[in-house]
Amino acid sequence: MNPRPVRPGGSLQQSLLALGSLSVAVGLAVWQQRTLGRGRSDSVTAVERPETTFSDVAGLIEAKEELAEIVTFLRDPERFRRMGARMPRGVLLAGPPGTGKTLLARAVAGEAGVPFFAMSASQFVEVYVGVGAKRVRDLFAAARKASPAIVFIDEIDAIGRRRGDSQSHQEYEQTLNQVLVELDGFHPRQAVVVIAATNRSDILDPALLRPGRFDRRVELSLPDRAERAAILRVHAQDKPLAPDVDLDALAARTVGLSGADLENTLNEAALLALRRGGDEITQADLEEAVDRVIAGPSRRSRALSARERETIAVHEAGHALVAHQLASADAPRRVTILGRGQMGGATVLAPDEDRRLWTRGQFLDRLAVLLGGYAAEEYRYGEVTTGSSGDLSQASALAQAMVTTYGMGKSLRGRAFDANGPVSDETSRAIDEEVSALVSEALELASRTIANAAHLLDALVAALLAEETLDEARLAAILGPRPARPAMN
């Protein structure tokens, strides 16, 4: 064994060098954490006084009425104290994306004339532990100093997810805990209201929703027809509209679009008008803009064989014809064989009035419309194509919901089943049989409707092949008046 020579002091020098490297690494990490935390914390204290008011928010009447009390409290908190009334510390705005949650929060601050501190919940959290909690403390400290004030936390589900959830994380939980501490720590004389927004209220931690925290909940839903018309008018105020523009008609065919979608529709229409060199937005621009928002731009350059083009026309004509002939179905408003996105063509349907309740008969008509393209292909060619795959998926999902959610089956009438819950093999087979029976019944209805009005199917197909797109007026000229719709079918 040959011992290795060791220079005097070598091990000490190496130890000191290693210790120095470790100190530098730790120092850099601490500096980086403080720098990042400080940089983002400084942005937390940025404050504004919005000029937005409730008059800038079209629709949402009930939500504005609910929040008017918050405005009164922020304007005159002493009045509430004299009455011994405790205002909610937190207000949760819950609803689908684009329904105006942020706009409404800004309008509350604008109406009250108070400072508005806004952050997205995802901005609180970094990879470093403790940074999120520090930003929460900084945000609430700034709001207390500026009292009366509003703190707005957008997408609070980013940090407010139910603790113990498989997708939760230690830093998110610490940040949530700090938010809870701050909500509990308000002094009675501090007029600070916290407004949070979420699309997923179902996953929020119950501790957020208990009294004294976010104990006032305001649900925002997609706008109804009257609200859509009001939203369109608000966003059309600064845009030149041609005399043929009918915003009420546009509101009728934009069922399911949010306020943000409607704003985007008008902006798209303005861009389309500029693209064609026009000085005004026409109804045609608006119709094309709706199609773009819903399904994307048309694909005119896509090469199709004559048979494929005809098949698409037959398929879309089938949807439109069944929708027109069935009294309880939504009316066809626009049909096109121009491809958009992954779709070969499209049939746009819209009810004469918004619905809140559906009967089994109405759902059955809706199923028949979904299967109208399938039935038309089968009637014309004796076989079907892959173009019906999306329709079949939607029809199957609706039939499943009718049986398992709405109790509209026959052998399982009046019963509901948890979609993710366990059921016996016998019940599972019964559900499958009920769903299959509903789809078969709807397909038979669609096929019978098309066979009884084959001349109208031929007329629609010919018009689509010649014109590519048919609007509501053109459809009415070809198909004639619709059957009278019963009040409840």
UniProtKB/Swiss-Prot annotation:
The keyword Heme does not apply. Its cofactor is Zn(2+). SUPFAM superfamilies: FtsH protease domain-like (SSF140990), P-loop containing nucleoside triphosphate hydrolases (SSF52540). Its EC number is 3.4.24.-. It is an enzyme of class 3 (hydrolase). Pfam families: AAA (PF00004), AAA_lid_3 (PF17862), Peptidase_M41 (PF01434). The chain crosses the membrane at residues 15-31. It comes from the Bacteria. The keyword Nucleus does not apply. The active site is at E316. Its main location: membrane. It is a single-pass membrane protein. Zn(2+) binds at H315, H319, D391. It is found in: Cell membrane. Residues 1-14 are cytoplasmic. Residues 32-489 are extracellular. GO terms for molecular function: ATP binding; ATP hydrolysis activity; ATP-dependent peptidase activity; metalloendopeptidase activity; zinc ion binding. Keywords: ATP-binding, Cell membrane, Hydrolase, Membrane, Metal-binding, Metalloprotease, Nucleotide-binding, Protease, Transmembrane, Transmembrane helix, Zinc. Homohexamer. In the central section; belongs to the AAA ATPase family. This is ATP-dependent zinc metalloprotease FtsH 3. It comes from Sphaerobacter thermophilus (strain ATCC 49802 / DSM 20745 / KCCM 41009 / NCIMB 13125 / S 6022).
